[in-house]
Amino acid sequence: QPTYVSSRHYYLHMDTTAYGDFDFRNPRYHELQCWNVPGFIRIEAAPTFVELLEKLTAFLGRQPELPEWIYNGLIIGAQGGNERSFGIVDKSLEHGIKVSGLWCQDWCGKRVTSFGKRLQWDWHFHKEMYPDLPKHIEELHARGIKFLGYVNPYLVNDGELYAEGKKRGVFAKKADGSDYLVDFGEFYCGVVDFTNPEAYNWFKDEVIKKYTLDIGIDGWMADFGEYLPTDDLVLANGVSPMIEHNHWPVLWAKCNYDAVKESGKLGQVVYFMRAGGTGSQKYCTLLWAGDQSVDFSRHDGLCTVICAALSSGMVGCGLNHCDI
């Protein structure tokens, strides 16, 4: 996002999604670069940082309010299927731990590669690892505990949803007209083309609503958004992927937001994201700092989480969290 906040109590924002960078090394001036002509450059000032942030978020958008349940206990991250994941909840409660949610990112199944276990990128509950998941979610709800899963904007090319999406023509193309497949490490995935209204609505309605919200899921990691390829990928709207790349996280956030809002569950459901761009603030219920090292190292440990929280908060994503 091409925005910075100055210690002199002003912010500057460039209206562009092209590649850009800011150079603050010279004490007398700032050097701004972007690979197109921005629509405008916006500067606003205020007496205090609080007032300045009010102005900036009024311009960029503000995050939806979080539901009360997210503050009422631990959200446990567990994997391995029904017995193990729900068993950890039971043990936690037995030991007096207050639990508000269970996050099972492998609710969709696992995929074994030569370098470890990955998820099965086919966004519906895995009937072998999580049989009768909707029933188990109901049982959690009866105990006042929420269930969270995982979704990202790609579909693995040997999955059920990819086959359905291919019939509907929802994937971004290569220059030769074939589906653009991304290599994610021993498996390939189609890129759902959110610039195509039919593809956008299909993913929103037939994937997020049908396979997550409709079975009672209360939240999910809405992962990725930052990986749009920029070589020979062709989008439905005709815009170069070099320009659309930094806008992609906004489209991904909006797709999740629209699914939740249209289902009447805004303020009840929480999805957390690791990517963002100009305008994603109003569509992102919670920002996630990414995969840090569980240590105090300078470049990827606890201190980086603090920097990320402060920086994201200063550009309108004050609701954020990190893994423990």
Positions of predicted regions on the chain:
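Catalytic-domain carbohydrate-binding cleft regions of carbohydrate-active enzymes
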Residues: 1-324
